[in-house]
Amino acid sequence: MILFNRVGYFVSLFATVSCGCMTQLYKNTFFRGGDLAAIYTPDAQYCQKMCTFHPRCLLFSFLAVTPPKETNKRFGCFMKESITGTLPRIHRTGAISGHSLKQCGHQISACHRDIYKGLDMRGSNFNISKTDNIEECQKLCTNNFHCQFFTYATSAFYRPEYRKKCLLKHSASGTPTSIKSADNLVSGFSLKSCALSEIGCPMDIFQHSAFADLNVSQVITPDAFVCRTICTFHPNCLFFTFYTNEWETESQRNVCFLKTSKSGRPSPPIPQENAISGYSLLTCRKTRPEPCHSKIYSGVDFEGEELNVTFVQGADVCQETCTKTIRCQFFIYSLLPQDCKEEGCKCSLRLSTDGSPTRITYGMQGSSGYSLRLCKLVDSPDCTTKINARIVGGTNASLGEWPWQVSLQVKLVSQTHLCGGSIIGRQWVLTAAHCFDGIPYPDVWRIYGGILSLSEITKETPSSRIKELIIHQEYKVSEGNYDIALIKLQTPLNYTEFQKPICLPSKADTNTIYTNCWVTGWGYTKEQGETQNILQKATIPLVPNEECQKKYRDYVINKQMICAGYKEGGTDACKGDSGGPLVCKHSGRWQLVGITSWGEGCARKDQPGVYTKVSEYMDWILEKTQSSDVRALETSSA
């Protein structure tokens, strides 16, 4: 535990307003007060991640640099809360502060790939193995049940006996117990949270069975599935036992025991009525739960500290209210006659120390449930459009089938469709940077949404104008990298059944395996063709990057790209489809997985299309959309 001495630094006049998604980091700034916990992290980004997953943390301060007398505080991550959502800022050189990402659905991810040269992340060393490089060391950690982080000593390390050795480590908190600078050492974290473990994924649920292994913690949960999710995101839980509300010992009813063992596997389950046991899903590659619980439990009362009371129409509205209230962790919606008025029934917003109810009782007239603040896509409620299923080899789409698709048209002597794009917000469209090669002038562009046929467009057809064009700063003409651009519209869109946004993926979706993917657009239906009048659609399989690279030996297919297409050809995006969406259905939602970018010809055999991988640009998208909105607010306030 790190203790921070209260020193009389200069206090800023600015308050920290915690409303909605706040991703900004404040340099040379420290939040005063509100201390919850202190840990060590290698950088501010990991500190922010830890704050996001802490049940009460709203703000954090990280010390990247400290005075010589305070070296024990360097790399200190101070997690904080505030009743008002604000804390005073003080100036401190080397400090970096920011907000939890609890309300930033697309940013929420436990995966952390960064490695840190020159740092020794210390913990309990439980395994030392010889490996040839840092990648092998990280893989070794990822495929070990107990490894949370590691340190690798290079061949230049000053102690010969440790050279090219990989030290696997863990701690009670899952974070380093201290961090020191050291030459020729490299540290990093396990990639289990990135769905890259090869351990395997036992998903068995054992009814009327209990594990008798070591308990690492316990929480109150309404069922075994919430228990399993909590186990999955706990740093030391490998399996669990949950006792139902019919368990004979009253004090253990609805108790979820989080467990571990030295071997990483549980002992054989013991037959026990009203007990349910199972495994953490941390090592799963495909089936990983989100760190949230969406089910609403009828006739159940979640007890906890009362945060606020309001009156609403329905348990789902109560859950939405809880989700939008950043400190709310769970809620009770009462249907008792004395708790109902004209405007609705009583919605009690609640919280606890660990984010779980302090007690669960049954038989009430009403419902209980959890905040959805840690659900990946909770901040895009309008993007949940359900649909019924450039395109070479495609078929005509139906009106409203792909409501996020837009046509980007240039108006010079005449008006022409040039590219596609995707609605991602009321004032934002995402497309390809190369669409603006030679035409980077916002005034000449028109954006049409909610249409099926290009021939429908007349002078009276509503269109949007560009207020701001944001092309990725690393994009270069005639290169395939960083082919992404944001369009800010002059006027916010009105959402209709024909014009709605597509869900954006989370950063954690980098390794998600998609099986139901489609491309859409008005582009050519053959290589030497012409723009189509009716929007085309085509289902298309994704191609692994390694296989795609073999087809394009003269180009580099990097992790910021994703490929799709049939081996035999015949279906692909083509000219006029650029900037349009590659969407995939995953966990019941359509997500924007790719942006049509480039390829060799159209629908050629063994020449898949190459798309910009959206999940790799989520930080950039959020940074640019938020900074633009902040600038607009500052301008309007001036």
UniProtKB/Swiss-Prot annotation:
Residues 391-626 form the Peptidase S1 domain. Its main location: secreted. Residues 1-19 form the signal peptide. It comes from the Eukaryota. Its EC number is 3.4.21.34. Inhibited by SERPINA5. Disulfide bonds join 21-104, 47-77, 51-57, 111-194, 137-166, 141-147, 201-284, 227-256, 231-237, 292-375, 318-347, 322-328, 340-345, 383-503, 419-435, 517-584, 548-563, 574-602. The keyword Disulfide bond applies. One of its GO terms (cellular component) is extracellular space. The keyword Disulfide bond applies. Residues 21-104, 111-194, 201-284, 292-375 form the Apple domain. It is an enzyme of class 3 (hydrolase). GO terms for molecular function: serine-type endopeptidase activity. Gene3D superfamilies: Hepatocyte Growth Factor, Trypsin-like serine proteases. Keywords: Blood coagulation, Disulfide bond, Fibrinolysis, Glycoprotein, Hemostasis, Hydrolase, Inflammatory response, Protease, Repeat, Secreted, Serine protease, Signal, Zymogen. It is found in: Secreted. PROSITE patterns: APPLE (PS00495), PAN (PS50948), TRYPSIN_DOM (PS50240), TRYPSIN_HIS (PS00134), TRYPSIN_SER (PS00135). InterPro entries: Apple, Pan_app, Peptidase_S1_PA, Peptidase_S1_PA_chymotrypsin, Peptidase_S1A, Trypsin_dom, TRYPSIN_HIS, TRYPSIN_SER. Belongs to the peptidase S1 family. Plasma kallikrein subfamily. The enzyme cleaves Lys-Arg and Arg-Ser bonds. It activates, in a reciprocal reaction, factor XII after its binding to a negatively charged surface. It also releases bradykinin from HMW kininogen and may also play a role in the renin-angiotensin system by converting prorenin into renin. Forms a heterodimer with SERPINA5. The zymogen is activated by factor XIIa, which cleaves the molecule into a light chain, which contains the active site, and a heavy chain, which associates with HMW kininogen. These chains are linked by one or more disulfide bonds. This is Plasma kallikrein.
